[in-house]
Amino acid sequence: MSRLSKEEISERLLELIKDETKPAIGCTEPVAVAFTVATGKKYMQGEILKIDLKVSKNILKNGKSVTIPNTEVCGLDIAGALGGICGDPEEGLFVFKNVNKDYLDKAREMIKNKVVTLNPIENTDPVFVEATLKGEKDEVIVILRRGHTNIEKVIVNGEIAFEKDNKNEKDNKDCDFMKELSLKDIREITEDISIEKLGFIMDGIEMNKEAAKEGLKRQKGLTLGSSLLKLQQEGKLGKDSATIARILTAAGSDLRMGGGMCPIMTSGGSGNQGLCVILPITVVAEDIKAPKEKLQRAVFFGHAVNNFVKKYTGKLSAICGCAIAAGIGATAGITWLLGGKDKEINGAILNMLANLTGMVCDGAKGSCAIKLSTSASEAVISAYLALNDIIVPNNTGIIGNTVEDTINNLGMLCKDGFYKADDVMLSIACKEVI
């Protein structure tokens, strides 16, 4: 374990999970763009005449095809326009909270009049937005980096109005400390942490269950969840926990990708990852009638493992983090919930990695529900397989000598092997913009 004491590690892990597990309305990439513009608007006097947006290719890929909440439209340009019209930076990940038809009409008028420009830029952090706002009196430049609401710098009329102190940037410390942990360390912290500190976990469980219910009712996104439910009602799909997890996770993603206004608890800064971590664990807990405290700890474990994996793969990457990192978190939480020890927990993770490694990210959109639903059901199945001693052998393919070695292999594959593949995918998915 780290040079820090176990108590310090536990507190730091809790702080990280709380920071990366917050409610959000809408996909967090358009949110990041709207939040950046809304922040700039706060520093301006008078009307916005021009908005120039520069975004990382990963922000572009993950934001261009997902529906903005309470609208039927997609696009980072319109997200930026809405941020300038009705965005409130104090709302954070709820920046789209005030969107309505009148504001949408104004945003469309801005796009029509070419008030907003959008360009991808190379060689920057995966999470990066720069917004230049020009008004009647002021010019404001806002830079967001490394987090969907992490404003790094604000420049007003050539003068620095705000600059974040990055010398003690806790994100970097968190990354270092997480990589010093093992899965066993995280499991031990999960079991030892005071249950009084995990109240926010139940908030996320209830929030994402409600989102799944709404997704089944409303015709949003791909409508995969309601379609799978119909197949189940017709007797073409079973009523086991893997299938139920598949249906509910798909429904939650339908709602989120389809512009629903229902808040969703994130994991690792992503709403889809929050759905994929929380819902499968919750379904299994309800199936086995697990005590509330055990469910809370299992979901906390799932969040922690998701974040652990993403310290290797990156916050936004070439692989589908929602299906792979979050799915790994879910299967770890499920296996622990079902009484699995380190051998079975690690085995379930290896089963997921042997199965889903290679699932690429081709951007946030309605069909993300398919990937999430696959991961949700496989997370349940992988856990039960590991508990029945069906575990992929070490040193075969992507699987290394230990589970930590394997996650490191995933990170190497993602950052070194898939780097060019991600560029190709970006050129395919964003060819009309790049």
Curated annotation (Swiss-Prot):
Q: Name one GO molecular function term.
A: L-cysteine desulfhydrase activity
The lineage's top-level taxon is: Bacteria
InterPro entries hit by this protein: Ser_deHydtase-like_asu, UPF0597
Q: GO biological process: what's one of them?
A: L-cysteine catabolic process to pyruvate
The family assignment reads: Belongs to the UPF0597 family.
UniProt name for this protein: UPF0597 protein CLD_2616
Q: Which organism is it from?
A: Clostridium botulinum (strain Okra / Type B1)
